[in-house]
């Protein structure tokens, strides 16, 4: 298998997930700056022009990080990272969606409204950036109150929620947002999970 990727949260969470599952993938870096995704060869593989996407041995293409994760879970059930029972699946999804929709999306809104890189891609608003950051902080408190695990966010093993949240915090630090420092359980988890081989290898 090959995964075409670029250093960004969605690709990072898939890499962490794959390492925790002990699934071997060849990673192919894509040059986004020079619009490699818009070349005929790449658009033939993925008309959406996005990364990451997974190319199987038979040429099948799987787009979108969540679809890739579902596929990887399906081809190697152990260790289970999406939930063993209906309740486990629901609890994992709660945290995973909070990390993605409550934190990652707010960070994206924030950076799109303050970064000079996006200045020519649409109107920017300091008020919108501040609102996004406030929502991020509010959702961090919800996350803090939701952590029930010690080494991991929930249960006694890594799940997709750990992968999503770690990649979210990596992105937050890259854009200078470190408000998570005030949340003790969250930061204790972040430090422990950051020492795992899946993180060291991904770096």
Regions found by a protein language model. Name each.
Residues 1, 193-196:
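Intrinsic structural disorder
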Residues 1-130, 151:
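GST-like domain detector, emphasizing the conserved glutathione-binding G-site
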Residues 54, 66, 136-139, 198:
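Aromatic-glycine hotspot motif
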Residues 99-194:
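GST-like fold's C-terminal all-alpha helical module
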Residues 201-203:
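Short, flexible loop/turn segments with low-complexity composition
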